[in-house]
Curated annotation (Swiss-Prot):
Binding site for (S)-2,3,4,5-tetrahydrodipicolinate: H156, G165, T166
InterPro entries named in the record: DapB_C, DapB_N, DapB_N_CS, DHDPR_bac, NAD(P)-bd_dom_sf
Name of the molecule in the record: 4-hydroxy-tetrahydrodipicolinate reductase
Compartments, record wording: Cytoplasm
Active site: H155, K159
Residues binding NAD(+): G8, G9, G10, G11, K12, M13, E34, G98, S99, T100, A122, P123, N124, M125
Function: Catalyzes the conversion of 4-hydroxy-tetrahydrodipicolinate (HTPA) to tetrahydrodipicolinate.
Catalytic activity field: (S)-2,3,4,5-tetrahydrodipicolinate + NAD(+) + H2O = (2S,4S)-4-hydroxy-2,3,4,5-tetrahydrodipicolinate + NADH + H(+); (S)-2,3,4,5-tetrahydrodipicolinate + NADP(+) + H2O = (2S,4S)-4-hydroxy-2,3,4,5-tetrahydrodipicolinate + NADPH + H(+)
Domain of life where this protein originates: Bacteria
Gene name of the encoded protein: dapB
GO molecular function (one): NAD binding
Source species of the chain: Syntrophus aciditrophicus (strain SB)
Pathway, per record: Amino-acid biosynthesis; L-lysine biosynthesis via DAP pathway; (S)-tetrahydrodipicolinate from L-aspartate: step 4/4
Pfam families hit by this protein: DapB_C, DapB_N
Amino acid sequence: MLKAIVTGGGGKMGARIISLLEEEGGMQLTGVVEKKDHPAAGKDIGEFLGSGKRGIVIQSDLGFCIAGGDVIIDFTSHEASMRHMEMAAEHKRPIVIGSTGFSADEMDRIRKFAQNVPCVLAPNMSVGVNVMFKLLKIVAETLGDDYDVEILEVHHRLKKDAPSGTALKMAQVVAEALGRELDEVGIYERKGLIGERSKKEIGIQALRAGDIVGEHTVIFGAVGERLELIHRAHSRDNFARGAIRAAKWVVRQEPGLYDMQDVLGFRS
């Protein structure tokens, strides 16, 4: 039985992972971590989620429970994830990270830590979204420079980062397939008399409203036709199941930095 620790267990994603963890089979929850000022900190996770006492107290520091776990599933913030990644490397505990918003320097540190422990880092754990990544590469390579590319993402009003990590990953996949540097061609805002659209730019726009779980649309537009690839998430369960799948996979891997394309076998 694989023993799992969930960091960010009081959040929306963490709560769904905990609820689904043992339903998936082969895994047991042994630890939960949440930031010190979170309402869940210090409470029994079962009582906090309304499912009855489970005997697992939500800790405010991963160090209090890391020894009791075989794998860490982290959905926190990029700052907290950096601390958890460092501890995972120190204690040789495989880790799955679903947080987004990492800086270039933080990514360099993650790669360094991953030399000592296997880590799956993915902005989106959904199987459907990761299939879309693969499709985007094929479509972009096939259509080439004759089609304009625009990406639109829509999320709930509480989401803190924009554009979403998933939208940025989609843009990166398309840019690489077209031989472009996203830093040079990414356009994140249009306003005023900006003139004609340049041929190679990739537009990435974000909308925030209500309780929308997540929607991503990639438009390939040319004169006379338009191709759209759309992914809509109706609940967080698809992300949670993907994270659990990644956790079962990562414990069998050698140290290194992986993503969901590796988990799903798309690179083999």
